[in-house]
UniProtKB/Swiss-Prot annotation:
Intrachain disulfide bonds: none
Keywords in alphabetical order: Ribonucleoprotein, Ribosomal protein, RNA-binding, rRNA-binding
Species in which this protein is naturally found: Shewanella halifaxensis (strain HAW-EB4)
GO terms, molecular function: rRNA binding; structural constituent of ribosome
Pfam families linked to this entry: Ribosomal_L23 (PF00276)
NCBIfam families cross-referenced by the UniProt entry: PRK05738.1-1 (NF004358), PRK05738.1-3 (NF004359), PRK05738.2-4 (NF004363)
Gene: rplW
Gene Ontology annotations of biological process type: translation
Function of the molecule: One of the early assembly proteins it binds 23S rRNA. One of the proteins that surrounds the polypeptide exit tunnel on the outside of the ribosome. Forms the main docking site for trigger factor binding to the ribosome.
Stored InterPro entries: Nucleotide-bd_a/b_plait_sf (IPR012677), Ribosomal_uL23-like (IPR013025), Ribosomal_uL23/eL15/eS24_sf (IPR012678), Ribosomal_uL23_CS (IPR001014)
Protein's recorded name: Large ribosomal subunit protein uL23
Signal peptide segment: none
GO CC annotation terms, alphabetical: ribonucleoprotein complex; ribosome
Assigned protein family: Belongs to the universal ribosomal protein uL23 family.
Length: 100
């Protein structure tokens, strides 16, 4: 069992983009930015418990940080991990919410 503290550290933020919006509408898939050391099992458990939905599958990828230059100095952005979480039929996560 994963501790509650770890569950809260696994999911960092929802990743909102054109591609993720299309995926949400067509495939019932939500995209999250997750901790770089998070496993698929941890992501699945975190989404299921935090949002109270049933998760079908989780696909992950690591985006490599780009090299950036400012004047004569060069630096590198951090690597980060993204998770595509497919929800069960009929399940939905509303990030926008808003007053009705």
């Amino acid at each position: 069992m994963i501790s509650e503290e770890r569950l809260l550290k696994v999911i960092l933020a929802p990743h909102i983009s054109e591609k993720s919006t299309v995926n949400a509408e067509k495939n019932n898939t939500v995209v999250f930015r997750v901790a770089i050391d998070a496993t698929k099992a941890e992501v699945k458990a975190a989404v299921a418990q935090l949002f109270e939905v049933e998760v079908d599958s989780v696909r992950t990828l690591v985006n490599k940080g780009k090299t950036k230059r400012t004047g004569a100095r060069t630096g590198r952005r951090s690597d980060w991990k993204k998770a595509y979480v497919t929800l069960a039929e009929g399940a939905d996560i509303d990030f926008v919410g808003g007053a009705e």
